[in-house]
């Protein structure tokens, strides 16, 4: 039973399986979780800009993901992080970053209408 649980992909959508197989794997849509965790940590905890996060990711994941794959998911990460902020905003908006968490209750205070353009411009220069 534990092996079945460990072999089950993470998918918060909880869609029922089709023909005994999971219909949607979130990681297929958003990218490898290990990359997203890496991007999130260095963006929020260290305050690094996209170009620095990209350089470190290329070194860290050398032999695991190539530059193009890392760049693809970095672009996706920034786009989704900003576009999905409204889902995390259940309290009044206000900027504040504490530790690596996106909860608006104590760690991340980010306006739900923040613009991703500044970050995406930096990421686009990496191509």
Q: What feature does the model see in each segment?
A:
Residues 1-127:
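ATP/NTP-dependent adenylation/nucleotidyl-transfer catalytic domains that generate, transfer
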């Amino acid at each position: 039973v534990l092996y079945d649980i460990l072999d089950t992909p993470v998918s918060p959508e909880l869609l029922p399986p089709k023909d005994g197989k999971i219909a949607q794997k979130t990681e297929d849509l958003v990218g490898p979780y290990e990359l997203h965790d890496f991007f999130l940590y260095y963006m929020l905890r260290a305050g690094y800009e996209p170009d620095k996060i990209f350089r470190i990711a290329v070194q860290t994941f050398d032999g695991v993901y190539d530059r193009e794959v890392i760049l693809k998911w970095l672009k996706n990460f920034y786009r989704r992080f900003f576009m999905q902020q409204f889902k995390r905003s259940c309290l009044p908006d206000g900027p504040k970053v504490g530790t690596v968490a996106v909860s608006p209750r104590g760690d991340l205070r980010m306006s739900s209408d923040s613009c991703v353009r500044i970050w995406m411009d930096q990421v686009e220069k990496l191509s």
